[in-house]
Each structure stands twice: as C-alpha cells, then as structure tokens.
Design a protein with these regions (language model features):
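Hydrophobic helical membrane-anchoring modules
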Residues: 1, 173-231
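Cell-envelope/extracellular polymer assembly enzymes that use nucleotide-activated donors
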Residues: 3-5, 31, 170
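Short, well-formed alpha-helical segments that are part of the catalytic scaffolds
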Residues: 12-26
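Conserved donor nucleotide-binding strand/loop of the catalytic core
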Residues: 30-33, 44-76
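A conserved acidic beta->alpha catalytic loop
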Residues: 36-45, 89
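Conserved donor NDP-sugar-binding/catalytic core segment of glycosyltransferases
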Residues: 94-122
Length: 231
C-alpha cells in the first residue's frame, strides 16, 4: 500500500482543526504532518494533544505563509504521495484507497477531490457545484479541494511557489504540464465560514476579481496587498 503523508498548514485554527483531525482516516498508510505558522490561539495545544495520542502524527513550526508551511511539511514527510489539506477540510474515510486507486495509472501525477460545504445553504450547493465544474473543465485545483501529488513530481516542480496568494493555482498550472491529473468525484467537506463572514455574493465577486487580476498578470504580492485593503 502506498504511503500517504497528509500535510496540514495551520494558523489560528483552534475551532476547525480538532474536527478535521478527528475525522482523518485511522489508517496506517497515513503520516500526518501539522505545520503551524506561529498561531496565537490554542491551535498548537489542539495539535499537540492530537500528536500525543496519534503515533504517526507530529507537529513542526514554519514561517507564516501557507505555501512555506506546506513546503516545510513536505520536506519533513516520508510518504510517496503528499496530500495537502486545509485545517478546515475533512477527507472521506476511504481517502487512502481512493488516492491509491487514482494513482494506479503511472501517467497520473496527482489530482484533487470534489468539494462540498458544511452547510445546508443553497448558496453552499451552488458555489461548490460551480467550483467543481470549473476545476474539472480547467484542470486547475484550489487548496480546499484536497490536492494530492506524487512526491517525486512535487520535488521536480520545486513545491509550491513562495507567494502570499494563488499558490494552489500556480501549482496546479505547473502540475498539469507535468502529466495527467484526476478530478475525483468523491468529496471532501470544507467550512463555509469564509463565505458567511462577508456574504456569498461579496465573496464570489472578490474571488473572481482576484483570479481575473492574477490571470492578466497582477503579481500575488500586489494581490495580497489589495486583498488586505478590501477585506
């Protein structure tokens, strides 16, 4: 069975992290690396408690920044396959089997899951349906879809670019050029909180604007400065 290393970057995620960790499949094929970016809440306490009770889990520290944290987690891991999860994203119980099956074709270098939100809201269903359709047609994945990749491919690509935004989009574009990728129909469950905080419509417009500006050449650092201003 393929060894899968799960890498979870954290920053002030005390409320969401516990549920994510509790729902990780209890499988010996999993190695769990929690990478904290200097949280100021109780995230590290939640992570430490989990690692104490889970032999194949450990926590490391890294400079704040999702791309940096994921890269450090990958360096610290040993698995032949890397699965990157957001701290508020839960995988299906049979995720290891699903990923291993997807990678039986040697031409496949990685992929992602479909996403659904932890809400009964109609907005949640509409947004997740569009996200999954867009990703399936474009081949571009976002971090909340549970991106997985063969280790040797990840290393050949140099990991995630050290940028403050769009690291998942940038990585997906490069991953597509490295080989075949799969868009799994099985779903991960992720939090709808980001959409609720500012309202679905406002968040949709913000995300579309950021993506458009990125595609036309605005740098992630410029986008990050603008994003902090308009939030």
């Amino acid at each position: 069975m393929t060894t899968i290393s799960v890498v979870i970057p954290t920053l002030n995620e005390e409320q969401a992290l516990g549920q994510t960790l509790a729902n990780l499949p209890s499988s010996l094929v999993l190695e769990i690396i929690l990478v904290d970016g200097d949280s100021t809440d109780h995230t590290q306490a939640v992570a430490n408690a989990f690692c104490t009770a889970t032999p194949n889990a450990r926590i490391i520290r890294a400079p704040t920044g999702r791309a940096r944290q994921m890269n450090e987690g990958a360096k610290a891991s040993r698995g032949a396959v890397l699965l990157f999860l957001h701290a508020d994203t839960q995988v299906p119980n049979d995720a290891p089997r699903i990923i291993e099956s997807a990678l039986t074709d040697p031409a496949v270098v990685g992929g992602r899951f479909d996403v659904r939100f932890d809400t009964c809201s109609g907005w949640g269903r509409i947004i997740s349906t569009f996200m999954n359709w867009r990703s399936r047609t474009s081949g571009i994945s976002t971090g909340d879809q549970g991106i997985f990749v063969r280790r040797h491919t990840f290393e050949q690509l140099g990991g995630f670019a050290d940028i403050p935004l769009m690291e998942d989009i940038d990585f997906s574009r490069r991953l597509k050029r490295a080989g075949s990728t799969v868009a799994l129909r099985q779903t991960v469950r992720t939090s709808f909180r980001r959409w609720e905080q500012q309202g679905p419509l406002r968040t949709i417009l913000l995300m579309w604007t950021l993506r458009f500006l990125y595609w036309v050449g605005v740098t992630p650092h410029q986008l990050a400065n603008w994003y902090q201003t308009v939030r």
